Amino acid sequence: MKFVDEATILVVAGDGGNGCVSFRREKYIPKGGPDGGDGGDGGDVWLEADENLNTLIDYRFEKSFRAERGQNGQSRDCTGKRGKDVTIKVPVGTRVIDQGTGETMGDMTKHGQRLMVAKGGWHGLGNTRFKSSVNRTPRQKTMGTPGEKRDLQLELMLLADVGMLGMPNAGKSTFIRAVSAAKPKVADYPFTTLVPSLGVVRMDNEKSFVVADIPGLIEGAAEGAGLGIRFLKHLERCRVLLHLIDLDPIDGSDPAENARIIVGELEKYSEKLASKPRWLVFNKIDLLSREEAEAKAKAIADALGWEEKYYLISAASQMNVKDLCWDVMHFIIENPVVHEEEAKQPEKVEFMWDDYHRQQLEEMEAEAEEEWDDDWDEDDDEGVEIVYQR
């Protein structure tokens, strides 16, 4: 299946149903009064995270989602039926962005998590709601309000504990093949990896972590060189980054300069990502003698001003790989994920306390009082009234 990590969709919530103007017509009840019902609320549009999905490719073909409109009110005080909601399933790890405002509406990080992205319109009011002591036969009603409409940008960001960084041919895919059951393509030319891949590293029956491999970065990636930096977003949720450095580059380039390029591209992309814990891992030590590999690694670390611990491994022969994985496992255990509080969904507002409807009622009642003619009122504060009859 083709890997698609970005998609744009249109979501439209249902409009609210209109109120009804109706009067009770029944035998022996000549003045039955108003009995027009309210309309139904429009349906909402929801997103739901599904762990069984791993790509957004479905939304390259189906781009528009519309919830059902609320039914209009009917006579005999019948309220219109509420419009049906629409639920759109997305992979776990999807970020939802409103294209109109650029606002991030939410991150779908848990299976079954739901996020409302378009609220249905409010129902209109029937003429029964406008009955009062001065208006016994109201002919007023209100229309339902339109549902929300949004263009959404969906961005899939892989959920991994460890992210792999490095130049093309640094050995990232070989490392994942060595520590997990994932089998990304491996070859001796640059950009063998074209899409991100995940691997689960199982240390024992109870301990495991997920590692993400992304295509290699080159100088100028922030400006779009190579495969650009579009895949760096998949590392934003990682807790630690493994920066693989090829001790013996096939093109004869300087490993220290290559490392500086990677750090520079990280900083251009995101300061938050650049500030994540980053471990230096020198790969392909099997191509050099032990003394030569250690000396070269120390020289590179000194050139980078690196004062923390670094690792020397060979992903191809799995030399020192197990020790590195255990250190990663201990780091993950000591630094658990801090989940952000999920965005609270607005509670459903009941009719009597709805500001929109209350305002409409007040306006209609004010108009009715202004138009009221009290010539037939027995209680007259202004004196005697004469009524002429033919």
UniProtKB/Swiss-Prot annotation:
- Which protein are we looking at? GTPase Obg
GO CC annotations, alphabetized? cytoplasm
Positions that bind Mg(2+): S173, T193
Function according to Swiss-Prot or TrEMBL: An essential GTPase which binds GTP, GDP and possibly (p)ppGpp with moderate affinity, with high nucleotide exchange rates and a fairly low GTP hydrolysis rate. Plays a role in control of the cell cycle, stress response, ribosome biogenesis and in those bacteria that undergo differentiation, in morphogenesis control.
Q: Which Pfam families match?
A: GTP1_OBG, MMR_HSR1
Assembly and interactions?
Monomer.
Composition-biased stretches, type Polar residues, lie in: 129-143
The record's region (Disordered) falls at: 127-146, 364-390
Q: Do you know which InterPro entries this protein is assigned to? A: G_OBG, GTP-bd, GTP-bd_Obg/CgtA, GTP1-OBG_CS, GTP1_OBG_dom, GTP1_OBG_dom_sf, OBG_GTPase, P-loop_NTPase
Q: Which residues bind GTP?
A: 166-173, 191-195, 213-216, 283-286, 314-316
Q: Where in the cell is it found?
A: Cytoplasm
- Broadest EC class assigned to this enzyme: hydrolase
Q: Which residues form a coiled coil?
A: none
Instruction: From the UniProt record, report the name of the gene that encodes this protein.
Output: obg
GO terms for MF: GTP binding; GTPase activity; magnesium ion binding
